[in-house]
């Protein structure tokens, strides 16, 4: 119960702050405040600390109420915490009343999102093209479609060190080709959060960017801060379930592709065991695992999926683990890794002698996604696309029906298996086949779906269970390797339940 959790968090916080003013509506908020202010969880606040924060609280309260905040279902503490994620306490304290009002105006969409129990709205397909009529010419609206755009891509790494960055760069070059003369793109590399990420996003905007894509979840903080400083710029971050209405987030429904590769794996397995490599227990990953297992069971009813995670400490090479168990069909990472064999990704077969044979792999058509978004901006549909969100943050989570997600099939697949995969691809793309529209039993024996209906996108994105065909578990925060914990703090399925001492900064 969130209310009970909030009560215990307040009881933990009060002895160090000794103030009743600060209240929040979201679990984890006290810990976030302490982290942002540089305080350890049990560190006693000095009288000066308390005076400083109370002064900020009253300063923000006055501006919040002047904006009509009294009618909203969020607290002054919620708004103060939001502001402190974007500005330092010194910056806030030095603002004039009019400047603070302007800052709050720029963040108002995010303030409205604070009162939502589910602050993220999932968009499952591209917006419909704008219909232009005679009145659009006689009485043009205030949101005029631009004739030319500058689009910037800010990457955490480079194409030579990251296949992920390379895929997004292919998408960027597609924009140059499709919108030649209308769109100009630029790329910025090696954006490190907490170091130069904010500066690189700012540089992109200084260089004239109208639209900025940041292609790593770790860049969401830099994206949010830039969006507040530059509300006229459209900023999108490649991540899931980020509750910030000032920016938009985007990802793909990988589980649809995993369902198809699972069916292929089941058909190609010589026995009843298949290996599966997962990276982080983040939003959407359990859905990927379950969809793969359900696809595999469709072609191999007695199959078991052996699940191995790469985010655990002292993790042995999963390929070695699987081969020691006699498992020869494996779903590996979704993209090639530097310094790894080029075929050790996607779903593959281990031949005698250790030779790897490609079977199939999920494939991202990022260019199609970027083309759809830029076309929406060019035709004036960006604001219209946002109008139905009811103050919530927008997360684009597009699937195979949008053309953004696909499955690459190996030419070495048997013809009958290729034919099956093509049927499944057509069915998933058309909506005739839903991977989760079936009876599903969890590992604990509970019925997760009766089979009379599918699961909605919110249920799929927040899935935190595994079906009964999977051997393995979803690791919790304490089990992860230290290097894996920052990503979990941002995208982990149980990130909001992290104890106080494990809270992270944005």
Q: Model-derived features: where do they sit?
A:
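Extracellular/periplasmic periplasmic-binding protein-like sensory domains
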Residues: 6, 10, 17-21, 29-37, ...
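Beta-alpha junction/loop-to-helix N-cap segments that form part of ligand/metal-binding clefts
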Residues: 190-232, 236
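Hydrophobic alpha-helical segments within soluble ligand-binding/sensing domains
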Residues: 250-272, 364-384
């Amino acid at each position: 119960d969130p209310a009970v959790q909030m009560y215990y968090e307040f009881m933990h916080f009060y002895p160090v702050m000794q103030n009743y003013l600060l209240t929040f509506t979201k679990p984890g908020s006290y810990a976030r405040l302490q982290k942002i202010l540089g305080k350890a969880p049990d560190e006693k606040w000095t009288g000066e600390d308390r005076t400083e924060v109370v002064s900020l609280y009253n300063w923000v309260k006055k501006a919040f109420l002047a904006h009509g905040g009294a009618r909203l279902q969020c607290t002054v503490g919620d708004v103060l915490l939001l502001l402190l994620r974007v500005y330092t306490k010194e910056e806030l304290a030095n603002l004039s009343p009019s400047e603070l009002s302007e800052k709050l105006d720029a963040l108002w969409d995010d303030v409205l999102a604070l009162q939502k129990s589910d602050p993220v709205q999932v968009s499952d397909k591209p917006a419909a093209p704008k219909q232009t009529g005679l009145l659009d010419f006689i009485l043009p609206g205030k949101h005029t479609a631009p004739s030319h755009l500058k689009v910037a891509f800010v990457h955490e790494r480079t194409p030579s060190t990251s296949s992920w960055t390379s895929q997004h760069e292919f998408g960027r070059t597609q924009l140059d080709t499709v919108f030649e003369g209308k769109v100009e793109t630029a790329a910025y590399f090696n954006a490190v959060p907490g170091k130069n990420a904010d500066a690189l996003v700012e540089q992109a905007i200084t260089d004239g960017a109208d639209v900025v894509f940041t292609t790593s979840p770790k860049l969401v903080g830099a994206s949010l801060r830039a969006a507040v400083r530059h509300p006229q710029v459209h900023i999108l971050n490649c991540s899931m379930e980020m509750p910030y209405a000032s920016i938009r987030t985007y990802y793909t429904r990988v589980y649809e592709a995993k369902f198809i590769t699972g069916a292929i794996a089941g058909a190609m397995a010589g026995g009843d065991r298949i290996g599966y490599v997962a990276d982080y227990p983040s939003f959407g990953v359990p859905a990927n695992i379950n969809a793969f297992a359900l696809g595999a069971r469709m072609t191999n009813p007695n199959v078991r999926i052996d699940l191995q995670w790469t985010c655990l400490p002292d993790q042995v090479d999963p390929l070695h683990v699987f081969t020691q168990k006699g498992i020869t069909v494996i779903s590996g990472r979704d993209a090639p890794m530097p310094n790894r064999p080029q075929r050790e990704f996607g779903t593959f077969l281990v031949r005698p002698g250790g030779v790897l044979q490609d079977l199939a792999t999920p494939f991202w058509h990022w260019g199609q996604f970027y083309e759809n978004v830029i076309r929406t901006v060019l035709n004036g549909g960006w604001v219209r696309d946002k109008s139905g969100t009811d103050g919530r943050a927008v997360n684009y989570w597009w699937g195979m029906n949008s053309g953004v997600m696909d499955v690459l099939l190996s030419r070495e697949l048997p013809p009958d298996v290729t034919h099956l995969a093509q049927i499944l691809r057509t069915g998933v793309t058309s909506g005739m086949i839903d991977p989760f529209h079936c009876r599903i039993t969890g590992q604990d024996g509970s019925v997760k779906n009766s089979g009379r209906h599918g699961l909605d996108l919110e249920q799929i994105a927040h899935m935190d269970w595994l079906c009964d065909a999977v051997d393995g578990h979803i690791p919790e925060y304490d089990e992860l390797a230290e290097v894996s914990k920052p990503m979990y703090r941002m995208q982990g399925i149980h990130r909001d339940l992290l104890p106080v001492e494990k809270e992270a900064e944005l």
